[in-house]
A protein has these predicted regions:
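Alpha-helical transmembrane-bundle signature of multi-pass membrane transport and export proteins
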Residues: 1-420, 429-430, 434-437, 445-448, ...
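Hydrophobic alpha-helical membrane-insertion segments
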Residues: 424-425
Length: 458
């Protein structure tokens, strides 16, 4: 019996050599930079108009909340309509909604309403893109590396975009920055329209889209392995956002101005970018999957050190290490795609993206609320304890061992692999339990961790 060989890592040349993936990748770069810049601009615009910190903060909340409704009620669109039409249509709708925010004199309630409606489009786009990616890059190492590249776009956009947003706001008005975001959506639509191929819908549909979406949600959660993978991919980031939710209170607590929080917020995205490069590019598939548990623990180990109120430089370093633990995403990406039955795959990926954004928003709110009533030296380490428990309880199964790790039995039995491959049926074979494959994972969006987006967080 031939040994099971785990596929090696793919290369950036192989992934970026695919024209359709290049179009998806380029569209994400353009629109994500516009999104992050516009997030800053809309927050500033609302604060300038109202002088209310609560209403300004509601911009961030409204970037997450629609994912619950959009993912649950509109998720079937990714299956019932052609993928390219969904992607281009979502971009054009978002461009129109963000463009309407530029209208002079529009009331704050109108701005927040437009933001909420634009947010409903986001999970539909994310689901269609996530479902399209396995068709563009077949499930395997190339798919995992492609997902990692898209996550890197999101994290890099957060690092670069907030600084770029500050520069643009110095040169333009908040409305000018919002207009730039609307143009970025239009540019993304053009790239996707001419850079991706037309495909038939993955499934037909009769009756209400909302009813179909809810039925798909029940079917996905009825699959035990998929449900476990989804809960892991949602609850780990929801616990890990605690230091970001409390960044401003933390820096003021250690005696620094609140504006220093922006530098603290760069720590986790920087570590996440490095983790995606290392895990998706350098590790073979079997090791990516076996690294999910230890990498998940690495996310929360540095947060326990916040019980000592580390100084600013040390705190940034701890958050970079926390971001490095995000390497668990590479293994989970392949696991979800393999675990989900083919007829539920696109629905599972859409639900994964929507749930990720929604649970992160809930995490921000809950940890921020905890920081109102408990000292920071307890809240952030408390998030570490909760997150560690989630990792241990919901840990997904690891991948199969590579052939080289199994060669010991051949040596002990005196048979080489070549001999075993040509031996008669009576020759000893590996037990089935040693050669089984575990199913595997992989969400969408923009990333495990994505920043809020006034138009769409991808």
């Amino acid at each position: 019996m031939a040994p099971h060989s785990s596929p090696g890592p793919a290369s950036y040349r192989q992934v970026l050599g695919h024209g359709e993936f290049r179009a998806i990748f380029a569209a994400d770069i353009v629109s994500m930079l516009g999104n992050v810049v516009a997030a800053v601009a809309l927050t500033v615009l609302v604060f300038q108009r109202t002088h209310s910190p609560a209403l300004a903060a509601s911009v961030m909340a409204l970037a997450f909340l629609p994912y619950l409704f959009g993912g649950a009620l509109l998720g079937a669109a990714a299956d019932r309509l052609p993928a390219r039409r969904v992607l281009v249509g979502c971009d054009l709708i978002s461009a129109a909604l963000v463009g309407a925010m530029v209208i002079p004199g529009i009331p704050v309630a109108g701005l927040l309403g437009l933001l909420f409606v634009a947010g409903l489009v986001s999970p539909v786009y994310a689901g269609a893109r996530s479902a399209l990616l396995p068709e563009v890059l077949a499930p395997g190492p190339r798919y995992v590396l492609g997902r990692a590249l898209l996550r890197m776009v999101v994290q890099s956009a957060q690092i670069v975009g907030y600084g770029l947003g500050g520069l643009l706001l110095a040169a333009l008005s908040p409305r000018g920055a919002l207009a730039a975001d609307a143009l970025s959506f239009a540019a993304s639509a053009a790239v996707l329209r001419f850079g991706t191929a037309a495909r038939q819908p993955r499934a037909g549909g009769a009756g209400s889209m909302a009813r179909d979406s809810l039925a798909g949600l029940r079917a996905v959660f009825g699959h035990r392995q998929v449900r476990r993978i989804l809960l892991f991919s949602w609850l780990v980031p929801a616990c890990a956002v605690a230091p970001e939710a409390l960044a401003a209170p933390y820096v003021t607590h250690i005696g620094l101005p609140a504006r220093s929080a922006g530098f603290l917020l760069m720590g986790i995205p920087a570590g996440t970018v490095a983790a995606d490069v290392i895990a998706a590019r350098l590790l073979p598939t079997w090791l990516q999957r076996r690294a999910v548990l230890p990498a998940g623990l690495v996310v929360f180990a540095p947060l326990a050190a916040f019980a000592t109120l580390p100084d600013f430089g040390v705190a940034i370093g701890l958050l970079v290490i926390c971001g490095l633990g995000s390497a668990w995403g590479a293994g989970l990406d392949g696991l979800l795609v393999e675990a989900a039955p083919e007829h539920l795959r696109s629905r599972a990926l859409a639900i994964s993206s929507a749930g990720l954004m929604f649970t992160q928003g809930i995490g921000f709110a809950l940890w921020g609320l905890a920081g109102q009533f408990a000292p920071l030296v307890l809240v952030i380490p408390g998030a570490a304890v909760a997150g560690t428990a989630v990792v241990i309880v919901l840990r997904p199964p690891g991948g199969p061992r590579p052939a080289s790790r199994r060669s010991g039995l051949s040596r002990r039995s005196g048979l080489s692999w070549q001999t075993r491959r040509t031996a008669p049926p009576s020759a000893p074979r590996w037990p089935a339990s040693r050669t089984r494959r575990w199913p595997g994972s992989g969400p969408a969006g923009p990333s495990r961790r994505r920043g809020p987006d006034p138009g769409r967080a991808r």
